[in-house]
């Protein structure tokens, strides 16, 4: 079970099914066993590193935010929280990959999603962009479930679920155990 406001990281080697699990949680794919249930007020938003947004081409950041936040001052504060205040008048296609990633997560938040599923959100981001994303997520009051291999990003999470090459799933007690990872069976048994 995952509760409102929790930060849950899905970790493990490449190819173990972490992204597949996100797709099941987003209801993009059906589970092969078990079931996924959400509370009645849950709204799930999904972030992937694919930034194909033809609907944003030719539009300024502030215009994209104005789709949901009509008050310009509030829209600018939201852009600032995501480190995008200086890009308010910049067209979407001129943004860096990191800026597009932050704008996409901002969009998910202002659309009213209270659960964010993030697939490698810091991949291909420079340090400054990654830090801006982390800061922005600190201000998000909903639940975040993320797949990541970024240790700095993972340090802000409350819970860790590790999926092994053998398909075993472990709930890890803390970040230090998550970093050690490979000694799991003995540590969790004690």
PLM features: residue spans?
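ABC ATP-binding cassette signature C-motif
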Residues: 1-190
């Amino acid at each position: 079970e995952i509760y409102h406001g929790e930060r849950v990281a899905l970790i493990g080697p490449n190819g173990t099914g972490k992204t597949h699990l996100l797709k099941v949680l987003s209801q993009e794919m059906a589970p092969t066993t078990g079931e996924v249930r959400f509370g009645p007020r849950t709204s799930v938003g999904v972030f992937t590193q694919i930034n194909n947004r033809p609907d944003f081409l030719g539009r300024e950041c502030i215009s994209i935010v104005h789709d949901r936040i009509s008050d310009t001052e509030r829209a600018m504060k939201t852009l600032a929280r995501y480190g995008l205040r200086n890009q308010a008048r910049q067209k979407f296609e001129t943004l860096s990959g990191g800026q597009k990633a932050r704008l996409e997560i901002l969009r998910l938040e202002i659309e009213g999603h209270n659960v964010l599923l993030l697939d490698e959100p810091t991949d291909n981001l420079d340090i400054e962009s990654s830090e801006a994303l982390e800061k922005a997520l600190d201000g998000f009051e909903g639940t975040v479930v993320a797949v990541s291999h970024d240790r700095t990003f993972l340090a802000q999470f409350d819970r860790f679920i590790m999926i092994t090459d053998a398909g075993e799933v472990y709930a890890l007690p803390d970040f230090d155990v998550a970093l050690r990872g490979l000694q799991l069976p003995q540590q969790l048994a004690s």
